């Protein structure tokens, strides 16, 4: 049951979900929305987690009025709280290994290893949250982007695979135009009308190694 007495009860349970407004404008209706670059951010408080899913309270203008807070306060608090959901970065190979060995995701988290990957073995990486829900929002955090840059050893592309995760690919050796076509093809093949709400975007992002710049990649 979603119960709370005040904003203070929600403050440390906030998290962010991101969408592409060109893809999912209908899912933004009636919500509090902040636009950053190509993404639209909506806000929720996760009051409980179960095997059936999350108990999310979505922030609407009516809820904001009832709580007596403004969007600047909500956004600031949500950016802080969002990191409480444990950012996870891993390779596909490591993920398969955990499935066979029944290991938790945190055991393969590259953020915990403090290593830089070798240029000759740089794979595609996945960025998500510990519960693998609404994990694409992790790319909004400059501190996370900088850690990724340190791990891959350079600038990188962000493939917006779904609202639950994004894929990370080193810039060297790839072209943004090819990656955009890849994302569009994957979206059209993997998503049906039933799960189309999980689509994030086909707009590949480029990020500087230091995490300072995140923008739409230029199609060479």
List the model feature ranges, each with a label.
Residues 1-118:
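Extended, low-hydrophobicity segments enriched in charged/polar residues
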Residues 110-133:
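Conserved catalytic core of nucleic-acid polymerases
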Residues 128-220:
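C-terminal structured domains
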């Amino acid at each position: 049951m979603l119960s709370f007495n005040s904003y203070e009860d929600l403050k440390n349970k906030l998290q962010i979900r991101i969408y592409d407004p060109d893809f999912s404008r209908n899912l933004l209706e009636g919500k509090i929305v902040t636009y950053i670059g190509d993404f639209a951010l909506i806000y929720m408080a996760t009051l409980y987690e179960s095997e059936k899913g999350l108990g999310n309270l979505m922030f609407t203008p009516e809820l904001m009025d009832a709580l007596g807070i403004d969007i600047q306060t909500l956004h600031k608090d949500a950016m802080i709280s969002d990191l409480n959901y444990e950012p996870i970065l891993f390779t596909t190979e490591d993920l398969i290994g955990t499935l066979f060995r029944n290991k938790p995701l945190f055991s393969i988290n590259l953020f915990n290893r403090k290593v830089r990957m070798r240029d000759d073995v740089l794979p595609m990486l996945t960025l998500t949250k510990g519960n693998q829900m609404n994990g694409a929002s992790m790319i909004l955090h400059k501190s996370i982007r900088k850690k990724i840059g340190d791990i891959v050893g350079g600038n990188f592309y962000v493939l917006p695979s779904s609202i639950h995760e994004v894929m990370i690919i080193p810039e060297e050796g790839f072209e943004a135009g090819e990656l955009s076509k890849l994302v569009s093809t994957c979206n059209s093949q993997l998503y049906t009308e039933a799960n189309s709400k999980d689509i994030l975007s086909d707009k590949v992002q480029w990020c500087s190694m230091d995490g300072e710049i995140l923008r739409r990649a230029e199609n060479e």
